[in-house]
Swiss-Prot record:
<feature type="coiled-coil region">
    <location>
        <begin position="90"/>
        <end position="188"/>
    </location>
</feature>
<dbReference type="GO" id="GO:0007019">
    <property type="term" value="P:microtubule depolymerization"/>
</dbReference>
<feature type="region of interest" description="Disordered">
    <location>
        <begin position="168"/>
        <end position="189"/>
    </location>
</feature>
<dbReference type="Pfam" id="PF00836">
    <property type="entry name" value="Stathmin"/>
</dbReference>
<feature type="domain" description="SLD">
    <location>
        <begin position="48"/>
        <end position="189"/>
    </location>
</feature>
<dbReference type="GO" id="GO:0043005">
    <property type="term" value="C:neuron projection"/>
</dbReference>
<keyword id="KW-0966">Cell projection</keyword>
<feature type="modified residue" description="Phosphoserine">
    <location>
        <position position="90"/>
    </location>
</feature>
<keyword id="KW-0333">Golgi apparatus</keyword>
<feature type="lipid moiety-binding region" description="S-palmitoyl cysteine">
    <location>
        <position position="22"/>
    </location>
</feature>
<dbReference type="InterPro" id="IPR036002">
    <property type="entry name" value="Stathmin_sf"/>
</dbReference>
<dbReference type="GO" id="GO:0030426">
    <property type="term" value="C:growth cone"/>
</dbReference>
<dbReference type="GO" id="GO:0015631">
    <property type="term" value="F:tubulin binding"/>
</dbReference>
<protein>
    <recommendedName>
        <fullName>Stathmin-4</fullName>
    </recommendedName>
</protein>
<keyword id="KW-0449">Lipoprotein</keyword>
<dbReference type="GO" id="GO:0005794">
    <property type="term" value="C:Golgi apparatus"/>
</dbReference>
<dbReference type="InterPro" id="IPR030514">
    <property type="entry name" value="Stathmin_CS"/>
</dbReference>
Length: 189
């Protein structure tokens, strides 16, 4: 990157000093950055894990590419060394784990049996309720049918009695007409 490009970039980004201060190795010993019109201090911001490359410069602005280098593990202790080594479980620990697993299995089995018993009881209650409702329906249907049959019987008997009464009245009327006719015939003779 050229000095002119870096200088123009510093004018565009006033927060670059804050950005650079995050990567400084020893920020307390560095003096604060003072911007001067024609000079840029390239040593002020030392960034070891980053590289800035100018890609394009035109009248509308500039473009840069920031390449982050992979972190180095120099001076970092090994990860595996800090972990305590697993010891082999003793026979007693294995036995305790097996007993705990057996207890869990028995508990789960008991819970399952309890759940199934509750479900079976609920099904039994539902069936009993359905049987009671069916019996009540049958009883009500029989009562309604008996009432209907009784009503039909009473209506039929009343209808027959009315017909019989009308027939008797007709017979009576016919008898009266016959008697009147006979009386007229006897009177005319």
């Amino acid at each position: 990157m050229t000095l002119a490009a870096y200088k123009e970039k510093m004018k565009e980004l006033p927060l670059v000093s804050l950005f650079c201060s995050c990567f400084l190795a020893d920020p307390l010993n560095k003096s604060s950055y003072k911007y001067e019109a024609d000079t840029v201090d390239l040593n002020w911001c030392v960034i070891s894990d980053m590289e800035v490359i100018e890609l394009n410069k035109c009248t509308s602005g500039q473009s840069f590419e920031v390449i982050l280098k992979p972190p180095s593990f120099d001076g970092v202790p090994e990860f595996n060394a800090s972990l305590p080594r697993r010891r082999d479980p003793s026979l007693e620990e294995i036995q305790k784990k097996l007993e705990a697993a057996e207890e869990r299995r028995k508990y789960q089995e008991a819970e399952l049996l309890k759940h199934l018993a509750e479900k079976r009881e609920h099904e039994r209650e539902v069936i009993q309720k359905a049987i009671e409702e069916n019996n009540n329906f049958i009883k009500m249907a029989k009562e309604k049918l008996a009432q209907k049959m009784e009503s039909n019987k009473e209506n039929r008997e009343a209808h027959l009695a009315a017909m019989l009464e009308r027939l008797q009245e007709k017979d009576k009327h016919a008898e009266e007409v016959r008697k009147n006719k006979e009386l007229k015939e006897e009177a005319s003779r």
